Amino acid sequence: MSQSKDTRRSNRPGWDEYFMQVADVVSRRSTCIRRNVGAVIVKDKRILATGYNGAPSGLAHCADVGCLREELGIPSGERHEICRGLHAEQNAIIQAAKYGIAIEGSTIYCTVEPCSLCTKMLINSKIVRIVYKEPYPDDLARRLLAESKVTVEHFVVPDIN
């Protein structure tokens, strides 16, 4: 027996949920051994670019050669400069730039709240809205965003029951 039209509609994800699900799938491409992060840049309900965290294109993956930050016991959020990987947000911005896609005025969906490095890039890229799922404790990023005109929203996965 088929579902009624009303039942099918109630299971249909809203746009924020849909794009966050896409970001979740993108995060599965990550090659970082510490955290899998995905990002999707969207404008007018159209995906412009995606990115996940990992080593630069053509270089050995962290999963293959190890993580210096892990070996040195460096906590998450510290000493980004010795990480061989790029963040998901950085890769999404780079992909858009590489293919000549304007991202000004767009929204970025991130599986993890952006760090201060990515936040500065997102502000300068003129992204107007950041939607993230998992909080990330970076006070500088939050202060920068509070000072900017960027809208920030914590996405909470809807309860389907």
Indicate where each model-derived feature is located:
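Zinc-dependent deaminase catalytic domain
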Residues: 1-161
